[in-house]
Amino acid sequence: MEFVKCLGHPEEFYNLLRFRMGGRRNFIPKMDRNSLSNSLKTCYKYLDQTSRSFAAVIQALDGDIRHAVCVFYLILRAMDTVEDDMAISVEKKIPLLRNFHTFLYEPEWRFTESKEKHRVVLEDFPTISLEFRNLAEKYQTVIADICHRMGCGMAEFLNKDVTSKQDWDKYCHYVAGLVGIGLSRLFSASEFEDPIVGEDTECANSMGLFLQKTNIIRDYLEDQQEGRQFWPQEVWGKYVKKLEDFVKPENVDVAVKCLNELITNALQHIPDVITYLSRLRNQSVFNFCAIPQVMAIATLAACYNNHQVFKGVVKIRKGQAVTLMMDATNMPAVKAIIYQYIEEIYHRVPNSDPSASKAKQLISNIRTQSLPNCQLISRSHYSPIYLSFIMLLAALSWQYLSTLSQVTEDYVQREH
């Protein structure tokens, strides 16, 4: 199937082949775990089990920031598991989430009542909290603070609907913006990045909001099926009486209008994303931050004006994801990628769409203010004949290529 999808994109096919034949290791070097303590090895095992995508880029981080981010991720995953578990009553969830930061300092605390897929991070929380306490104090302080603030925010929205666009921003801040702020403070604390990276909480928050809004927009149907609602009523209420009404065939037109309005809302974070990424100096940190962002803008471009969002999960092509991962290693390339996808959106904006003028104006502002002198260019450096030859050669060994690592597919799936 991936071969068929790549027929119209030979450069993606070539990059898939390069990635499978060793290009992945040039970008994401394999981490040597032999020297790690048993508890830290276990943490990385849980990281592999709960998120292959983040496991890859976390393990590519330099120095001690790698372990700090690994532990931070597992703690957040544990909190997210509590929040998402529909088998746990709200009455039990609220104190768990509000007090979760205190469990970091309780060596024996664990939670064994979860039925969620990733419950192991709760059942063996003593291993994770041990490695938390083994971190440098400068990292512990950041992680505990973010954990406390996020737990209170999650608890707040257990009994509260996402009604207004302000509520949407607030919820996304609690579950993703705080992650961006926490990571930024870790990067600065490690001295891999300048203090401004950790101090500018507005840009760090936008990094998280852009990713979270993309996930919420794309995962409309999945969330509906699971009984979750994250689209703001202030927007969808203009088109239907109930959010689930968008799946009805007779509502396809208004569903797409609502979708486009939400995507337009998400695009407003792009200037902050560009500012944030332009400040990064460490290559491993840049890769860690840039890749999810370019995946997000590509996903929004795929979702824009696309009624398939209401029929299933819209994914970018695996070859497209690989190409983005391999390209997004420097700021000029990232700007070119962003420019490409906002142009795709711009040219698909229906004139009759209620948010059309706002979308076009927003994209025009991004062009002139955040992407000056940037132009739409092909990122392929290979001749059509050469690419065709590579495709023919690769087709003969496609069975081998079919074992391609799942790391790229996970990048375009929702992170809980």
Curated annotation (Swiss-Prot):
The keyword Transmembrane helix applies. The chain crosses the membrane at residues 284-304, 384-404. GO terms for cellular component: endoplasmic reticulum membrane. Changing F288 to Y/W/L: Retains partial activity of the first reaction. Retains partial activity of the second reaction. CDD domains: Trans_IPPS_HH. It is found in: Endoplasmic reticulum membrane. Its main location: endoplasmic reticulum. Keywords: Cholesterol biosynthesis, Cholesterol metabolism, Disease variant, Endoplasmic reticulum, Isoprene biosynthesis, Lipid biosynthesis, Lipid metabolism, Magnesium, Membrane, Metal-binding, Multifunctional enzyme, NAD, NADP, Steroid biosynthesis, Steroid metabolism, Sterol biosynthesis, Sterol metabolism, Transferase, Transmembrane, Transmembrane helix. It is an enzyme of class 2 (transferase). InterPro entries: Isoprenoid_synthase_dom_sf, Squ/phyt_synthse, Squal_synth-like, Squalene/phytoene_synthase_CS, Trans_IPPS_euk-type, Trans_IPPS_HH. One of its GO terms (biological process) is cholesterol biosynthetic process. GO terms for molecular function: metal ion binding; squalene synthase [NAD(P)H] activity. The keyword NADP applies. Mg(2+) binds at D80, E83, D84. It catalyses: 2 (2E,6E)-farnesyl diphosphate + NADPH + H(+) = squalene + 2 diphosphate + NADP(+); 2 (2E,6E)-farnesyl diphosphate + NADH + H(+) = squalene + 2 diphosphate + NAD(+); presqualene diphosphate + NADH + H(+) = squalene + diphosphate + NAD(+); presqualene diphosphate + NADPH + H(+) = squalene + diphosphate + NADP(+). Gene3D superfamilies: Farnesyl Diphosphate Synthase. Its cofactor is Mg(2+). Its EC number is 2.5.1.21. NADP(+) binds at R52, R77, R218, K315, R317. It is a multi-pass membrane protein. Belongs to the phytoene/squalene synthase family. NCBIfam families: squal_synth (TIGR01559). PANTHER family: FARNESYL-DIPHOSPHATE FARNESYLTRANSFERASE, SQUALENE SYNTHASE. Catalyzes the condensation of 2 farnesyl pyrophosphate (FPP) moieties to form squalene. Proceeds in two distinct steps. In the first half-reaction, two molecules of FPP react to form the stable presqualene diphosphate intermediate (PSQPP), with concomitant release of a proton and a molecule of inorganic diphosphate. In the second half-reaction, PSQPP undergoes heterolysis, isomerization, and reduction with NADPH or NADH to form squalene. It is the first committed enzyme of the sterol biosynthesis pathway. This is Squalene synthase. It comes from Rattus norvegicus. The lineage of its organism: Eukaryota, Metazoa, Chordata, Craniata, Vertebrata.
